[in-house]
Swiss-Prot record:
The simplicity of the Cas9-gRNAs RNA-directed DNA endonuclease activity may be used to target and modify a DNA sequence of interest. This is CRISPR-associated endonuclease Cas9 1. GO terms for molecular function: DNA binding; endonuclease activity; metal ion binding; RNA binding. The keyword Magnesium applies. Mg(2+) 2 binds at D9, E513, H738. Residues 516-684 form the HNH Cas9-type domain. The gene is cas9-1. Keywords: Antiviral defense, DNA-binding, Endonuclease, Hydrolase, Magnesium, Manganese, Metal-binding, Nuclease, RNA-binding. Monomer. Binds crRNA and tracrRNA. Mg(2+) 1 binds at D9, E509, E513.
Length: 1121
């Protein structure tokens, strides 16, 4: 082996890399790999956009089918003879009783085809639990109105009363605000359409029964959600008709994972009887109870399971009470259960089975295991009536369930979606059926049994190469954020092995959070909680000490631990937790030698130096307690309260953390190796799911290839302790800290504690620690120093040095992908106008104040009005309305009012007018002009855009926020200057005929000319986002490395926006090399590169940050993809 250690600090959007020689401590390599974190929110945006396009496409297709139906049925329409302003809702209501012309019928039916309601509301209306929440309550009110009216009648009534019918809006009714939502079930639209068509059939013989049935099919027809797209003739792997020729019953069935140990078996539903029994048995086997064996017997487990199954209500508290009664012990004596995020006990309770026992038409207790498991499979996989009914018919071909039973199961599934929504177990029914007898007979948990039975986890790791397949490794990591970070890390491991050979050790630390925003919020939350607690402690201490808000600064002189002691004093309710005595703040400040900060459990056992393992106690009590736990020591101490008294006090405390409570009340024998191992796993080793996946996959890979690389995953809190003890400050302003953390992680594998953890370190008879290396007895402080002592001389000094910091390499994931979003989806209208100081007509994008009656709408109006009211289109094109309606309202109605608390607050004059007279109307002699709800204005001059103007439009229609893609760099030998050509995603398109996605040479040449690139200029290279760019001043020899962001400022030739090499952004006004000047005060670095006396080079890096300078990248740019 190479004596090298690889440390990896895997973050959400970064991987720190550190390689050192474990013998000499020499730092071999260090770099930070930076990449954009995977954002689940982006997937949501894409899904929503796809859904919108799909809905629009289907609506369009229904309209086409309606046109075809009218043509094929001989219903001729001529819209040149009727008004284009016919109200479809009036026609729908009219059609219920009176004759409609062909044109009127078409308009009415087309309106319903476009807006046909929501199909799943038909099931929800029968669901007794659906009326939870405001939205559901309003839908329920809509359903009540449907008992006497059609959707069309309700919609027309709302339109005539409130001037609005679509969407979600609030109106005033009987002086109260009332929310209305235009949501009705598809079945209501079907009933309305049927009534209209049956009425029209009386007047028009061409409306036949066949016509009615075909229309109703167009109106209500819907592909089954579990079938997906495609059909027998047009197969696709996105639907049930696979390209392989296979036809699936349910497309979601293929998403069920395979068993971890039996790869041919599907995983069981978590709601299956077998999974519920398995989970509870595993929980019971993990419990430690006050019996001779410390475990539950087979008979006791049977009793507990029968009890749980037959109780209507069951939770952890009730179950633990039963177990305590069964064992004749206290609930507090039961240990080893799982804890949720809020610190509460967790245990499986046969929830799904107990709920299913409430079914009235089915006798669940009489069903066998196989039937219950199948039923759970059906109810987990399917969510709606159609899917459930079809699956029951398929799975139970003997017709086991009557329609009445099916109906109840459908409603049961809807009412208990949280139970069946938990998904799938990691194991198959086959594997669990093998393990359940073992769980009854032994006190072992699942993994121990699997190991004993010789079950091997199946892996698809390839032995063909010694490099790790990152795709295979991340198959079991379902969080996309974590999976992306791990993939990047594995690429780094492979590159490091390729460059440096096999490693002796690989040590990994993984991010705590899985979202960048969540990570920031979590850090802020912890920092705020700590600050609040410190402030509260100091305030209480000051009030009691001198009756003021602050303690005198002098009390802290020569007393460096006083702040910590005061915080612990506050946490502990001003008591010594070993003696139970009250601690006076005056004694704590003036007689500091009386008190000490003690580790509740020895640091040599827990490796936990956090505040959670510390208490403030009398020095005499601390000496007497020694290296024992409170449980072991208190009842034998002369001047201490009993352990029972401590237990009662700790349980009642609101200020002690859950972890501290656990440490104070532990009754485990810390001299035993398995107890020590548990603390090591808790405080040193990261046992989270994703961390275990990475650890196991790497270990299995190296084992399969007979490589003796030891892999470990450590907790972030441990490396944080090392940072603190070594005095290495962490600044997040730059990306250096990732590499520094990685080296600390690598060095952590060489600490003395790793060498000593398997030895019996504590001599409990003398309450001292034995130094195995020297044979000398050492104190707790000396042991602490030994544990946290840096493994190499000058290692810490090196990490702190400026020379070391400057030598760290950085590598960025370059974004060269070509099929990204080309622009925002918002469609903008434009107009030609002279605005402000314009000397000629310019093209302006129109803005819109959507609702002038909201406070935000009024504020937006006033902002434009005060600056330049001529920006409003109404001011120019309808001056009478602006001068005789809008401005008088502004003059006569207030813009401020006194609220309920007597305070002056802003208000909206337009809203005040509306409350008195209704909507503002355009000026007319009779005062009945159209209602005004919004106002358009000239917003900004048209810049970069995509033209989507229809052929018959007089004004441009555009998309804005056009996204830049890449920049091609050219060199003009005549002028001696570089020229930059910017390309956007919108410049790419599919070539007609070939279907190739590309930029045509003709279009490229047009852009080249527009960008000021000479036809004879020499192509140098292409820059994508996050490519590195080296700029050299050929006169002064100064040079600086940048990250390329984009070609910018399109009206300025050859300008680009740059980012710093070693951090996220520049400081405002930051100095660059002289030829480029300074960064703008805003922090943006936009610079023209068309200068004399500079040289530009592309710098390509690998994942380890190794740099390769590129002067030329081929003869011509790539235009085909």
């Amino acid at each position: 082996m190479s004596d090298l250690v690889l440390g990896l600090d895997i973050g959400i959007g970064s991987v720190g890399v550190g390689i050192l020689n474990k013998v000499t401590g020499e730092i071999i390599h260090k770099n930070s790999r930076i990449f954009p974190a995977a954002q689940a929110e982006n997937n949501l945006v894409r899904r929503t956009n796809r859904q919108g396009r799909r809905l629009a496409r289907r609506k369009k297709h229904r309209r086409v089918r309606l046109n075809r139906l009218f043509e094929e049925s001989g219903l001729i329409t001529d819209f040149t003879k009727i008004s284009i302003n016919l109200n479809p809702y009036q026609l729908r209501v009219k059609g219920l009783t009176d004759e409609l012309s062909n044109e009127e019928l078409f308009i009415a039916l087309k309106n319903m085809v476009k807006h046909r309601g929501i199909s799943y509301l038909d099931d929800a209306s029968d669901d007794g639990n659906s009326s939870v929440g405001d939205y559901a309550q309003i839908v329920k009110e809509n359903s009540k109105q449907l008992e006497t009216k059609t959707p069309g009648q309700i919609q027309l009534e709302r339109y005539q009363t409130y001037g609005q019918l679509r969407g979600d809006f609030t109106v005033e009714k009987d002086g109260k605000k009332h929310r209305l939502i235009n949501v009705f079930p598809t079945s209501a639209y079907r009933s309305e359409a049927l009534r209209i068509l049956q009425t029209q059939q009386e007047f028009n013989p061409q409306i036949t029964d066949e016509f009615i049935n075909r229309y109703l099919e167009i109106l209500t027809g819907k592909r089954k959600y579990y079938h997906g797209p495609g059909n027998e003739k047009s197969r696709t792997d996105y639907g049930r008709y696979r390209t392989s020729g296979e036809t699936l019953d349910n497309i979601f069935g293929i998403l069920i994972g395979k068993c971890t140990f039996y790869p041919d078996e599907f995983r069981a539903a978590k709601a299956s009887y077998t999974a519920q029994e398995f989970n509870l048995l595993n929980d019971l086997n993990n419990l430690t109870v006050p019996t001779e064996t410390k475990k539950l017997s087979k008979e006791q487990k049977n009793q507990i399971i029968n009890y749980v199954k037959n109780e209507k209500a069951m939770g952890p508290a009730k179950l633990f009470k039963y177990i305590a009664k069964l064992l004749s012990c206290d609930v507090a004596d039961i240990k080893g259960y799982r804890i949720d995020k809020s610190g509460k006990a967790e245990i499986h309770t046969f929830e799904a089975y107990r709920k299913m026992k409430t079914l009235e038409t089915l006798d669940i207790e009489q069903m066998d295991r196989e039937t219950l498991d199948k039923l759970a499979y059906v109810l987990t996989l399917n969510t709606e009536r159609e899917g459930i009914q079809e699956a029951l018919e398929h799975e139970f071909a003997d017709g086991s369930f009557s329609q009445k039973q099916v109906d109840e199961l459908v409603q049961f599934r809807k009412a208990n979606s949280s139970i069946f929504g938990k998904g799938w177990h990691n194991f198959s029914v086959k594997l669990m059926m093998e393990l359940i007898p073992e769980l009854y007979e032994t006190s072992e948990e699942q993994m121990t049994i699997l190991t004993r039975l010789g079950k091997q986890k199946t892996t698809s790791s390839s032995n063909k190469t010694k490099y790790i397949d990152e795709k295979l490794l991340t198959e079991e990591i379902y969080n996309p954020v974590v999976a992306k970070s791990v993939r990047q890390a594995i690429k780094i491991v492979n590159a490091a092995i390729k460059e440096y050979g096999d490693f002796d050790n690989i040590v990994i630390e993984m991010a705590r959070e899985t979202n960048e925003d969540d990570e920031k919020k979590a850090i802020q939350k912890i920092q705020k909680a700590n600050k609040d607690e410190k402030d509260a402690a100091m305030l209480k201490a000051a009030n009691q000490y001198n009756g003021k808000a602050e303690l005198p600064h002098s009390v802290f002189h020569g007393h460096k631990q006083l702040a910590t002691k005061i915080r612990l004093w506050h946490q502990q309710g001003e008591r010594c937790l070993y003696t139970g005595k009250t601690i006076s703040i005056h004694d704590l400040i003036n007689n500091s030698n009386q008190f000490e900060v003690d580790h509740i459990l020895p640091l040599s056992i827990t490796f936990d130096d956090s505040l959670a393992n510390k208490v403030l106690v009398y020095a005499t009590a601390n000496q007497e307690k020694g290296q024992r736990t409170p449980y072991q020591a208190l009842d034998s101490m002369d001047d201490a309260w009993s352990f029972r008294e401590l237990k009662a006090f700790v349980r009642e405390s609101k200020t002690l953390s859950n972890k501290k409570k656990e440490y104070l009340l532990t009754e485990e024998d810390i001299s035993k190796f398995d107890v020590r191992k548990k603390f090591i796993e808790r405080n040193l080793v990261d046992t989270r799911y994703a961390s275990r996946v990475v650890l196991n996959a790497l270990q299995e890979h190296f084992r399969a290839h007979k490589i003796d690389t030891k892999v470990s995953v450590v907790r972030g809190q441990f490396t944080s302790q090392l940072r603190r003890h070594w005095g290495i400050e962490k600044t997040r302003d730059t990306y250096h800290h990732h590499a520094v953390d990685a080296l600390i992680i690598a060095a952590s594998s060489q600490l003395n504690l790793w060498k000593k953890q398997k030895n019996t370190l504590v001599s409990y008879s003398e309450d001292q620690l034995l130094d195995i290396e020297t044979g000398e007895l050492i104190s707790d402080d000396e042991y602490k120093e030994s544990v946290f002592k840096a493994p190499y001389q000058h290692f810490v000094d090196t990490l702190k040095s400026k020379e070391f910091e400057d030598s760290i390499l950085f590598s960025y994931q370059v974004d060269s992908k070509f099929n990204r979003k080309i622009s925002d989806a918002t469609i903008y209208a434009t107009r030609q106008a002279k605005v402000g100081k314009d000397k000629a007509d310019e093209t302006y994008v129109l803005g819109k104040i959507k609702d002038i009656y909201t406070q935000d709408g009024y504020d937006a109006f006033m902002k434009i009005y005060k600056k330049d009211k001529s920006k409003f289109l109404m001011y120019r094109h309808d001056p009478q309305t602006f001068e005789k309606v809008i401005e008088p309202i502004l003059e006569n109605y207030p813009n401020k009012q006194i609220n309920e608390k007597g305070k002056e607050v802003p208000c909206n004059p337009f809203l005040k007018y509306k409350e008195e007279h209704g909507y503002i109307r355009k000026y007319s002699k009779k005062g009945n002009g159209p209602e005004i709800k919004s106002l358009k204005y000239y917003d900004s001059k048209l810049g970069n855009h995509i033209d989507i103007t229809p052929k018959d439009s007089n004004n441009k229609v555009v998309l804005q926020s056009v996204s830049p893609w890449r920049a091609d760099v050219y060199f003009n030998k005549t002028t001696g200057k570089y020229e930059i050509l910017g390309l956007k995603y919108a410049d790419l398109q599919f070539e007609k005929g070939t279907g190739t996605y590309k930029i045509s040479q003709e279009k490229y040449n047009d852009i080249k000319k527009k960008e000021g690139v000479d036809s004879d200029s020499e192509f140098k290279f292409t820059l994508y986002k996050n490519d590195l760019l080296l700029v050299k001043d050929t006169e002064t020899k100064e040079q600086q490395l940048f990250r390329f962001l984009s070609r910018t400022m399109p009206k300025q030739k050859h300008y680009v926006e740059l980012k710093p090499y070693d951090k996220q952004k520049f400081e405002g006004g930051e100095a660059l090399i002289k030829v480029l000047g300074n960064v703008a005060n805003s922090g943006q670095c936009k610079k023209g590169l068309g200068k004399s006396n500079i040289s530009i080079y592309k710098v390509r890096t690998d994942v380890l940050g190794n740099q390769h300078i590129i002067k030329n990248e081929g003869d011509k740019p790539k235009l085909d993809f």
